[in-house]
Every structure is written in C-alpha cells, then in structure tokens.
Regions:
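Short catalytic/ligand-binding loop motif for oxyanion handling, primarily in non-cytosolic enzymes
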Residues: 14, 74-79, 117-120, 151-155, ...
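Extracellular/periplasmic catalytic domains that process cell-envelope and extracellular macromolecules
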Residues: 60-61, 152-155, 294-297
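C-terminal target-recognition/interaction regions appended to catalytic cores
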Residues: 227-324
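Flexible, glycine-/basic-rich loop-and-beta segments that form/coincide
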Residues: 152-225
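Short alpha-helical segments and helix-capping/turn motifs at coil-helix boundaries
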Residues: 52-56, 144-148, 286-289
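Structured loops at beta-to-helix junctions and adjacent beta-edge loops in soluble globular domains
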Residues: 6-9, 148, 164, 304-306
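Core alpha/beta nucleotide-donor-binding catalytic domains of modification enzymes
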Residues: 1-105, 114-127
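Conserved Class I SAM-dependent methyltransferase catalytic core
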Residues: 90-165, 169-170
Length: 324
C-alpha cells in the first residue's frame, strides 16, 4: 500500500502507518503554518521524503492508497478558550478534506482529533465533513475511543474520522473493532525505566516541599504523611487523574476557603487570592483549571500541556525524569 500524510505534525500517526504498511510515506503535504512542527519528522526521515507545502504553490505529486492527518484539535478542544465554530483552527480539517478527497482521491483518508468532534461542540464540523465526503464520492465513519481501552495507562479520549472511497467500498463502510485491552499500570511503566540517559527531573522541585497544595494535603489533611505514604493509600481517580487539588476537593471535601486559610497561615500570600477566586468560580457552577502535582496510580490523565512538568515518581519524592 502506498501511503502519504497531510499535516502530520510531530509524526506519530505517519510513523505508525510506516509500521502497518511496511514502507515510508510517498510524500508529506502540509501548510507553511506547520513547518516548524514537522521539521523533527523530516529530520527523522533524513529529509529524504518529499515535502510539499500547499500554500506555497506545491501540490500532491501523485496518487496513493491511504492518506493520514493530525489536524490541530484546538478548535474543538475543551482546553481551548474558544472551542467551536468560530475557532480558526477548524479550517484545517475542512481544507485537508477538500484537497485530499477532491485532488488526491485515495482509497482511504483518515485523521485524529479531539473527542468533541462527535459531540455537540463538533456537530457543525462533522456535518461539514460529511457533506465534503458526499460531494467527492466518499462514505464517512467516526470512531470515539480512549487510550485506556487500547492498553495504554492514560485516560485520554480521542476521535478518529475515516473517508472511504465509494469506488472501492461502494455504499458500505467497514465495521470498526471494539477494544478493551488490559493496561500496564502507570507506576510500573515509570519504575521499570532502566537507563542512565536523560534521568534528570523535568521539574527540579520537590513535590512535598515546593507545591503548597500537596504540602497542605500531606501535613494538614493526612497528619504528616510522606510522599510514599500517600501513594500507598491513594486510589486511582476516574477521568481527571490524581491531581492534588482534585483529591483535596473531591475526596477529602476541602473547599478553597479552607485551603486559603492554611495558605495565609503558612505565608503563601500569592495563593490566598487564587484560592478565593477558585472558591467563587466553583460556587457559581463554573470550572477551574487545576495544574498542580499529580501522583501516578494505575493510570494518568492526558499527558499533554502541563502534565509532564507536574507528574511525580510514584515512590520517590520527586518529579519524573525525561527518560521516564
């Protein structure tokens, strides 16, 4: 099978395609906005894969069987401040679908995106993609899943969309498999790292000393427990993960005014108004962003954005290393 990619970004999807099909991509298509993101992938291929930038006058050099894509998901992501129809990041799914289905015409074009693609926030985009597929003689299917179901100790939902060329598949689309594979525990993944390379911590702080919320949990709530003591009693929390602030509010039922009072007593003056703002936001039915220390147990949340900087070693009072 000949395959190619459009907007592969860091390249995980196209590298997986290499393994599936047993050969490198015929070419990579992209736009100038993503050149920096994709330079690592091109270097990995020793700059031997043709790279065509469509908004600089390039075009696809030929037909292939399968094309993959990892368009930016920020337009549909809950992490973004403006998810939905008015986010400019959504143009990329639309553009790539128009170009690949209209010009390249592979047997299959598929991509990965935020889980909201199949929800209310993403309905407008899904409707557009379906119409583009029909206009170009393709059927479409969407697959919602999470890493944990595929044996990866990370709770992260993702959506995958597929366009099937009707000249090959007719009016039918393949039935996609259901998976519920057992996962290796995240603490075992971390503790089984055996290397002397890149073993310096990403975050050089000491969790129990330098994160005031974690210090509050250990010293005030758990009566002087150590990091290891806490790991031993910790139970894995669904979906959001084991971030300390969620544990404080959801498990130990501490509100941010209680936490703020302790912060003031201990001299964390900058945290006091933050605690009050968080208290009021939650009281008004709004959400807050929690980016504090996370102790791994069983599995973790989405390993993106701040996560690598706040995830601890399960047993040692430190944050994970680059190799871990």
């Amino acid at each position: 099978m000949k395959h190619a990619a459009i907007i592969p970004l860091i390249g995980g999807e196209v590298l997986a395609s290499d393994q599936v099909w047993g050969n490198r991509p015929e070419y990579i298509l992209s736009y100038s906005a993503f050149k920096d993101n994709e330079s690592h992938l091109l270097n990995y291929y020793d700059n031997e894969i043709p790279y065509h930038v469509l908004d600089e006058g390039d075009s696809a050099p030929g037909r292939v069987d399968v094309v993959s894509s990892v368009c930016p998901c920020a337009g549909l992501s809950q992490y973004h401040s403006k998810p939905g129809a008015h986010n400019e990041n959504n143009q990329w799914m639309r553009k790539t679908a128009h170009y690949i289905l209209g010009e390249v015409k592979p047997l299959v074009f598929w991509g990965e995106n935020a889980p909201a693609l199949v929800g209310k926030i993403g309905k407008f985009m899904l409707d557009e993609l379906r119409q583009i597929s029909l206009d170009n003689g393709y059927g479409m299917s969407v697959y919602l899943t999470k890493n944990l179901s595929h044996g990866v100790p990370q709770f992260r939902k993702r959506s995958f969309y597929f366009f099937w060329n009707k000249k090959e598949f007719g009016e039918k689309t393949p039935i996609l498999n259901y998976y519920e594979r057992p996962h290796e525990k995240i603490e075992d993944v971390i503790t089984n790292v055996k290397s002397n390379f890149q073993m310096e911590p990403i975050n050089k702080g000491t969790p129990s000393k330098d994160d005031p919320y974690y210090r509050y949990l250990l010293e005030e709530v758990l009566d002087g427990a150590s990091h290891r003591d806490y790991y031993d009693i910790l139970e894995a929390q669904p979906t959001r993960g084991n971030d300390v602030e969620s544990i404080l509010t959801d498990v130990y039922k501490k509100d941010y005014r209680q936490i703020g009072a302790w912060m003031e007593k201990e001299g964390y003056e900058r945290e006091v108004p933050k605690c009050e703002r968080k208290y009021l936001k939650l009281a008004n039915g709004n959400n807050i962003m929690r980016r504090g220390t996370i102790v791994p147990k069983d599995y973790i949340g989405a390993f993106v954005v701040h996560y690598p900087n706040v995830l601890t070693h399960p047993h040692e009072d430190r944050y994970i290393t680059y190799r871990e």
